[in-house]
Amino acid sequence: YKRQELTEKADEQAIAIFGENLRNLLLQSPLKGKVVLGFDPAYRTGCKLAVVDETGKVLAIQVIYPHKPATAAKREAAGPAFKKIIEDYQVDMVAIGNGTASRESELFVAEQLKAVKRDVFYVIVNEAGASVYSASEVARKEFPDLQVEERSAVSIARRLQDPLAELVKIDPKAVGVGQYQHDVSQKRLAEQLDFVVETAVNQVGVDVNTALSLIHISEPTRLGMISY
């Protein structure tokens, strides 16, 4: 009995920590009024770039190959291509995903930005769950014409702009902020994380001009919002 009691207490503590970490992630300050370039790093398949405007609308998608094993010609072309997209769309911030090839990509971006004549900053963004989102039904509906990796770059850019609006599209268990998540009660964990997401959204509120269309909003309500 004592062992079961200790296990239950440990489970509750792990679930509570997961919930608190998720809340902190969801309630990060948004970055308003900036054009952001999402940079999804990779080696062999190239780095995916996505430019989104101040409202999160996708303006441009591109792939560059700044890292080996790409050919010398491709690596040489990556810098000018990156600077061109920065200038063409007057990008304010670069959001670099923290996955594979992140460190090399950070060095590449920092070096290229030295040649840009205005202030453009970069930041490393936690991309946990971006691949889950980009392969999801929600992402396919939102971006039917984009490849999975291109959707990831968009998600990385938007996470910097509005973490809450982007992260609510992903199963909370996929954002990688918990411990022992597969060892605890999945039902209790799901209930706690759903509660955290709901309270975070209620605390911040929803901008219907930019919020994702959700299935639990009825068609008449949606049409009413649009006509209003």
Pin down the residues of each PLM region:
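Single conserved hydrophobic/aromatic residue that forms the stacking wall/gate
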Residues: Y1, I215, E219-Y228
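Extended, charged alpha/beta regions that create polyanion-binding interfaces
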Residues: K2-K32
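Well-ordered alpha-helical segments embedded in enzymatic catalytic cores
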Residues: I17, N21, A77-K84
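Gly/Thr-rich phosphate-binding beta-strand-loop-beta motif of the actin/hexokinase/Hsp70
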Residues: P30-K57
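Residue-level signature of catalytic and energy-coupling elements of molecular machines
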Residues: D40, V94, L160, H216
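Short glycine-rich, Thr/Ser-proximal phosphate-binding strand/loop in the N-terminal lobe
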Residues: V52-A73
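Conserved phosphate-handling catalytic cores of large alpha/beta enzymes
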Residues: A73-F82, Y89, M93, T100-V201
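C-terminal extensions
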Residues: F195-L214
